[in-house]
A protein has these predicted regions:
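Rossmann-like flavin
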Residues: 93-192
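N-terminal glycine-rich phosphate/pyrophosphate-binding loop and immediately adjacent elements
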Residues: 3-130, 417
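Helical element adjacent to the flavin cofactor pocket in flavoenzyme catalytic cores
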Residues: 199-244
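Mid-domain catalytic core of redox enzymes
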Residues: 238-350
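Extreme N-terminal leader/targeting segments of oxidoreductases
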Residues: 1-6, 23-24, 204, 420-426, ...
Length: 471
């Protein structure tokens, strides 16, 4: 008889873990507290009827590039990736926009004087993506499978974005690099902030920054559908208060952050391990707004209409100042804003002729400050008349994010700070294993961290199976 396992949380990592266990022949139930599976990968009507908004994640470079997701027949279960003509636009105050094109050579040409430097930064990893992705989307190995490639990445990754940006001569290229680095939620003068910039750029050139047709829920639904073919079950509206109440299961994989794991694991976890989890640090938060629009955003630069993702923040120096303020517990007067406009490329997101947009800025964890005016001022700066396009808006504060997904602690959408210490010990030196032999953690608080890629769940499940002698 196959062993019965339980995955707590039906986010992408929980579903990935469940699929790995089911593929190994285990019985799997996935228990999800919310009425809809997906965690932060859900699509909901948040403004007006007929307008579909991604609650959390919206653009999926690491989803499309995930070694595990790529191994699954998700297209047979309804997943369709849509690529905008350009992955990213970064408008500037002169009315032009710096474009990150899918084609690396085209991007190098557009960056002119910085084209060669851009190529040196990213080309080795773009050309060897099939080797690079499994390395970067997993726990740090003492001896990498591709040591030369990873040594080259490490030489850049351990630096700050500020340091690496000194190689770039044009303010336009430096601005582009700053926006990419800001995905780290770190100050741009901190170690590892360069790693995020390079990874985001590499993924754009290697696999693109696609959106799922119909929204992030389509990825979730495809994962659930495939899991069902393996006889796995997803049971929604089933919050778990304590593992002691789940006596029918022999193995637990928890798509939970350390704070929730302490509560759910209770006395099943050793006191010393609970203490380690208790010292885990959460990062800056997102202040998010969803928009129903009567037309496309009126960008000064029409190039912005070619990209599903737009970075709003101006120069490197301005973005660096904004991120440094947030990291110091302050609120920026000119915040870096990340905006997506999926309905330009996926007409299923809004009624005919109408559009949706999604934008957030960074704020300190747990912030209660209303950043709506400052966020919209940044959009208006590069798209005058934007406010006149708004039919309805839904503000989602950090506390709202957490209430809609308990893993988004204080509004942290990345599963915890990714500074050097917490990068190495995420969430502890054990990574996926806990002090209990039958309990594992598989959330974004484990390697490789945030992003929708399922690799935290994949590696956690593989670790659990190895401990059972099934690998």
């Amino acid at each position: 008889m196959s062993r019965k396992s339980c995955v707590i949380g039906a986010g992408p990592n929980g579903l990935a873990a469940a699929i790995v266990l089911a593929q190994a022949g285990m019985q799997v139930d996935v228990l999800e507290a919310q009425s809809t599976p997906g965690g932060a990968a859900r699509t909901l009507e948040l403004t007006l009827p007929g307008f579909q908004h991604d609650f959390g994640s919206a653009v999926y470079p690491l989803g499309a590039g995930s070694p595990f997701f790529s191994s699954l027949p998700l297209s047979d279960h309804g997943l369709e990736w849509i690529h905008s003509p350009a992955p990213l636009a970064h408008p500037l105050d002169d009315g032009a926009a710096v474009m990150l094109e899918r084609d690396l050579t085209e991007t190098q040409s557009a960056l002119a004087i910085d084209g060669p430097a851009w190529g040196r930064l990213v080309r080795p990893f773009v050309e060897h993506w099939s080797n690079f992705a499994p390395e970067i989307l997993g726990p740090l190995r003492v001896v990498p499978r591709h040591p030369g490639l990873m040594a080259r990445f490490g030489m850049v990754a351990l630096q700050s974005a500020q340091s690496v940006a000194r190689r770039l001569r044009s303010p336009r290229t430096r601005a582009l690099f700053a926006g990419l680095a800001a995905h780290s939620f770190l100050s741009l003068d901190e170690p590892l902030s360069a790693a995020f910039a390079v990874l985001m750029a590499v993924s754009a050139h290697a696999v693109g920054w696609p959106i799922p047709r119909g929204g992030g829920q389509s990825l979730t639904n495809a994962l659930c559908s495939f899991l069902s073919t393996l006889k796995g079950r997803v049971i929604t509206s089933s919050p778990v208060q304590n593992l002691a109440s789940l006596a029918d299961y022999e193995l637990f994989l928890c798509d939970l952050t350390p704070r929730q794991l302490i509560e759910v694991g209770g006395q099943r976890l050793s006191e010393s391990y609970r203490r380690q989890l208790g010292s885990y640090r959460y990062g800056a938060a997102a202040f998010k707004v969803d928009y129903a629009l009567h037309g496309p955003i009126p960008w000064k630069s029409s190039d912005c209409l070619r990209a599903a993702t737009v970075h709003l923040g101006g120069s490197f120096e301005e973005i660096a100042a904004s991120e440094k303020a947030v990291r110091s517990g302050q609120h920026s007067d000119r915040p870096f804003v990340l905006l997506t406009q999926p309905s330009l490329f996926d007409h299923s997101r809004a009624p005919a002729g109408k559009h949706t947009a999604w934008a957030y800025c960074h704020v300190p964890n747990g912030s209660r400050v209303n950043m709506l005016d400052k966020l919209e001022s940044q959009i208006e700066r590069f798209a005058p008349g934007f406010r006149d396009c708004v039919l309805a808006r839904r503000v989602i504060s950090p506390s709202d994010l957490e209430s809609m997904d308990a893993n988004l602690v204080g509004g942290d959408i990345g599963g915890g700070v990714v500074d050097l210490r917490q990068f190495l010990f995420r969430p502890t030196w054990r990574h996926y294993a806990t002090s209990a032999k039958d309990i594992y953690i598989c959330s974004a608080s484990t390697p490789p961290g945030g992003g929708v890629h399922g690799m935290c769940g994949y590696h956690a499940a593989e670790t659990a199976l190895s401990s059972l002698g099934r690998r």
